Amino acid sequence: RRVLIRDSKLVGADLSLSSLQHVTLASCEARYLNLSQSRIRDMSFTGCRLDECAISQTALKGVIFDQCQLNRADFFETPLKGIDLSSCEIAGIQLSGKELVGCTVSPLQAIALAQLLGLLVKEDW
């Protein structure tokens, strides 16, 4: 029941409204991947390019993002509690702010997210 997808092209794949369990995507090119309104459990994304993917209104449980490119990814209305994005690129990530409760990010990501949410970050204190 475990699926490994490695070194594959999933550019623009529409997996919206799907239910995914025990899946690993490794070193995949998956820009524009659509996982919106899906239920994802025990899934791992490792070294994947997921720029501009849509993961909005999605239930995530036991999901790992490791060394992924998530630039301009849409996580609107997807709770990220328990998700660690600290090893990923997340420039221009799309969300309202409430999704970030309980999400782990690096210090530099925290500064960028604060600015994205409209905070003015003062560098000299």
Q: What does each model-found stretch correspond to?
A:
Residues 1-125:
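Tandem repeat scaffolds
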